[in-house]
A protein has these predicted regions:
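Class I S-adenosyl-L-methionine
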Residues: 129-130, 134-176
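Conserved class I S-adenosyl-L-methionine
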Residues: 118-128
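Conserved SAM/SAH cofactor-binding pocket of Class I
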Residues: 1-61, 65-68, 74
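Short "lid" loop at the C-terminus of a central beta-strand within the Rossmann-like core
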Residues: 72-73, 115-120
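Conserved beta-strand signature within the Rossmann-like core of class I S-adenosyl-L-methionine
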Residues: 108-114
Length: 177
């Protein structure tokens, strides 16, 4: 079983369903995101594998795998679309970490997909992130890193080039400590 917290378009839930899982719950608290996720999941023919639920973060159930790709930058969103980019005071990230252990089955894992762009922009430190993980009763079981391949990572005329060229997106494998 798996949960996709903050599913947005439903893409992570769909990838999980396509790869190997058949019992997936995808949650979001934004009505437009829920509508989009339901539309995409139905169009992909995955409606029997994925259940889309309205929730602030977690469903009531536990799972073997809980994934989350929260907004990457601490900041105040000024429009609904910006809620996918900015996470005021890192609220969603902190709440995901704080609630993760309670929503994992024994031996389960949480997968946090997060860019370190905020670190390169001095908006958050790695030490803060690791502190939040530890405070939540979690430990890092592993991490997979990927360098971005989008054009802005290589555009030295971009105002954020110094940060973007160092950016790494990571899949943090988290387990109960």
């Amino acid at each position: 079983s798996a949960v996709d917290v903050g599913t947005g378009t439903g893409v992570l839930a769909a990838v999980l369903a396509q790869r190997w899982l058949s019992n997936i719950v995808a949650t979001d608290n934004d009505p437009r995101a829920l509508e989009c996720a339901r539309f995409n999941i139905q169009n992909l023919g995955m409606g029997k594998q994925i259940k889309v639920l309205e929730a602030d973060l977690f469903p009531e159930s536990k799972a073997d795998l809980v994934v989350c790709n929260p907004p990457w930058l601490p900041g105040k969103p000024t429009s609904p679309i910006e809620r996918a980019i900015y996470d005021e005071n890192s609220g969603m990230l902190k709440a995901f970490l704080a609630g993760l252990a309670a929503h994992l089955n024994a031996g389960g894992e949480g997968w946090l997909i997060l860019s370190d762009l905020a670190e390169h922009l001095n908006l958050r430190t790695r030490e803060e992130l690791l502190g939040w993980i530890e405070a939540a009763g979690l430990k890092v079981a592993g991490r997979l890193d990927a360098k971005p391949k989008h054009g802005k990572a290589f555009d030295n005329t971009d105002g954020l080039f110094d940060a973007r060229c160092k950016e790494m997106t990571s899949l943090w494998r988290l387990v109960a400590a």
